Each structure stands twice: as structure tokens, then as C-alpha cells.
From Swiss-Prot:
The gene is pyrD. It comes from the Bacteria. This is Dihydroorotate dehydrogenase (quinone). It comes from Bradyrhizobium sp. (strain ORS 278). Its cofactor is FMN. The active site is at S173. Signal peptide: none annotated.
Length: 364
């Protein structure tokens, strides 16, 4: 089914404007039959944040912003899905065009600006799938015109606690002016204190929903020191490393398209984000797990991200170029690696190469 979907959709979608193609992909997923997914190899199971993931491959936030197709994605083999980013009130985001393919680089630049249907509508959709099962996280953000962004995050935690498998506090999108300032130590401390207090207030009716922090790959190591210190001190359950980058590597082939403003994702982000995973892993010192994101487009890339320190991984931009069949391909490669090396689970290799990657001889 997945192969047929890719064969039919990928050539067509390439001819469309990137955002129109994304919209068509969402509509196509709504039409897929509700077929039970193939059971994953037990070796791929991951226990993290108090949750049991059937496999480590997740759909990153940004694809299903409005919780329209989380169950279709789970049926296609993802171990978990992260919807959003969601803001308290609906917002249209930045003007189009705002999504660009760099095809020769297998990359994407976006300046979407947290366009979404708002908390009320997204909550209704998630509540409607309450008995479906599967891990569906909610990525939360602040409205662009908010007078109190911390209050936005608190409101979203309280709103979505009954339906979220976990929360991602997104303070690292480059497309909302000033949002990344929340990564500064004093502001981050205040934000996480209030977010975790909100989570604790609703614990009785919603359970102990994990709260993760998503960071940018463009932090300096000193800034990363501060972020990890605050995250550990306040007791977050995990971190997602990383969001898109504002950097433009000299290696990009599509230099004219690379001049578009926004966050760069896809293959050119791989080394930068993997280095940031490793740097975060050594600073976290096992206090909580990490999800690695950025440029994962093969089983080998997934393995590298895991060995850098990621317990779980997420995909998005690579699916634009490789199709949804990439999910099963990565899982098959990871299973083969475990069998070949005689290991029982991926947890045995998480962070195995972190020290090497953080060394000077593993340049970005």
C-alpha cells in the first residue's frame, strides 16, 4: 500500500507548489484504508518518557499541524506522531510563498509562521480519536501577537493534557519573531517553571503527561550549557534536538533558492543537528532521553543519530524526497543492524559515538 501511494503521489506532488503538494498529501492520507499496521520487531521497541514506543521512528511536528491524519500515519508504520505546532488562537501564518524545495540538496526552507486551526478545533479532532491508541504528541507554540507568550504555553498544556501522549514546548521555531529568545536562561526558567506547574495541576485528570523541550541547532555551546542546566533543574522529561537552522552551508547547490528566509531542514541539516544531539547527550548525563531530528534520510543516518545520543528519531523533510516507504526502510535497516551485531535493543547503542562526534575531528 505504501509503495503504491509513493509511486502515485511523488511524481505528481513534485509538479505542484510545495505547500499545495503538502495539502494534497494530507488529503490523500485521509483516503487510505484503515489497515492495521504490520507488527514491529520487538527489538525496535523503546521505553522513554514513561511511554512504550513500538519503534523509534516518529513523524515530526509540522507535517500534520492540525491533527487531521495522526492515525493514518500510525498505520503507515510510524512509532509515534507529533502534531502541531498548535497555538491558542487560530492564525494564518506568514504570507505565501513560505515553503520552498531545494531539490538538488534534498532540503526544504520554510517560514510558515505557526499557521494552524487553533486549540479549540485541534482539541476536538484529538478528542475524537480518544480510543484509537498509539502515541500522539502535541507540539505547542505561542501566537505571534500574544501579549504573554508564557501564558499561551500554560493554556495549551491545560487544554491538551487529557488527549496528549506527550507535550513538546516549541521555543525554537525561527519563523515567529522573538520566540527563540525564550531559550535564554532566565526566560526559559520562568517558562518551564510555569509549564510544569500547569502539567502538575491537571495531573489528577490527565495523568503525568511528559513535557519535552525542542531546541534550535544554532545555539552556541555556552547557550546549550544554560538550556540543559535549566531543563535538568526544572525537571523536563526530555528534549528534541533539533529544529530547523538559519544557517546556509556553503555546500548548498541551490544558492539562489537558499537566499529565501526561513528555517532550513533536510539533508544539509544532518551534520549540524547530529553534532547538537551529541553535545546535548553528554551534557544531559542520562537525566532524560533525547529525540533526534534533522536530515535523517536512510537507515544509516538514523543509526548515526541514535549513536550520537538519540533514543528516538523523527522524520519530515526526507519524506518529501524519499516517500513514506522510508519509514519501513529505516526500521528494516535498524533491525538488520541489531541482528548483525547481536544486540537485543537500540538502547544498547544510544550515545555510543557521542564522545567522538563532539570531538574536534567530527566537524559540522
Amino acid at each position: 500500500m505504501i509503495r503504491a501511494f509513493d509511486q502515485l503521489s511523488l511524481p505528481l506532488l513534485r509538479w505542484l507548489d510545495a505547500e499545495d503538494a503538502h495539502r494534497l498529501a494530507i488529503q490523500g492520507l485521509k483516503l487510505l484504508p484503515a489497515v492495521k499496521p504490520r507488527a514491529d520487531d520487538a527489538k525496535l521497541a523503546v521505553r522513554a518518557f514513561g511511554l512504550n514506543f513500538p519503534n523509534p521512528v516518529g513523524m515530526a511536528a509540522g507535517f500534520d499541524k492540525n491533527a487531521e491524519v495522526p492515525d493514518a500515519l500510525l498505520r503507515l508504520g510510524f512509532g509515534f506522531v507529533e502534531i502541531g505546532s498548535v497555538t491558542p488562537r487560530p492564525q494564518s501564518g506568514n504570507p505565501r510563498p513560505r515553503l520552498f524545495r531545494l531539490e538538488r540538496d534534498e532540503a526544504v526552507i520554510n517560514r510558515m509562521g505557526f499557521n494552524n486551526d487553533g486549540a479549540e478545533i485541534v482539541l476536538r479532532r484529538l478528542a475524537g480519536r480518544a480510543n484509537q491508541g498509539g502515541i500522539v504528541g502535541v507540539n505547542v507554540g505561542a501566537n505571534k501577537d500574544s501579549a504573554d507568550r508564557v501564558a499561551d504555553y500554560v493554556r495549551l498544556i491545560e487544554t491538551f493534557a487529557p488527549v496528549a501522549s506527550y507535550f513538546t514546548v516549541n521555543i525554537s521555531s525561527p519563523n515567529t519573531p522573538g520566540l527563540r529568545n525564550l531559550q535564554q536562561a532566565s526566560q526559559l526558567d520562568d517558562l518551564l517553571t510555569k509549564v510544569l506547574e500547569a502539567r502538575d495541576r491537571v495531573r489528577r485528570k490527565a495523568g503525568d503527561t511528559p513535557v519535552l523541550l525542542k531546541i534550535a541547532p544554532d545555539l552556541s555551546l555556552a547557550e546549550l550549557d544554560d538550556v540543559v542546566h535549566v531543563a535538568r533543574s526544572r525537571g523536563v522529561d526530555g528534549m528534541i534536538v533539533s529544529n530547523t537552522t538559519l544557517a546556509r552551508p556553503n555546500s548548498l547547490r541551490e544558492q539562489m533558492r537558499a537566499k529565501e528566509q526561513g528555517g532550513l531542514s533536510g539533508r544539509p541539516l544532518f551534520r549540524l543537528s547530529t553534532r547538537m544531539v551529541a553535545e546535548t547527550f553528554v551534557r544531559v548525563e542520562g537525566a532524560f532521553p533525547l529525540i533526534g531530528v534533522g536530515g535523517i534520510d536512510t537507515g544509516g543516518a538514523a543509526l548515526t543519530k541514535i549513536r550520537a545520543g538519540a533514543s528516538l528519531i523523527q522524520l519530515y523533510s526526507s519524506l518529501v524526497y524519499k516517500g513514506l516507504g522510508l519509514v519501513e526502510s529505516i526500521k528494516a535497516d535498524l533491525t538488520s543492524t541489531l541482528l548483525r551485531t547481536g544486540r537485543e535493543s537500540l538502547s544498547e547503542i544510544v550515545g555510543a559515538d557521542a564522545a567522538t562526534i563532539t570531538a574536534e575531528d567530527w566537524p559540522v
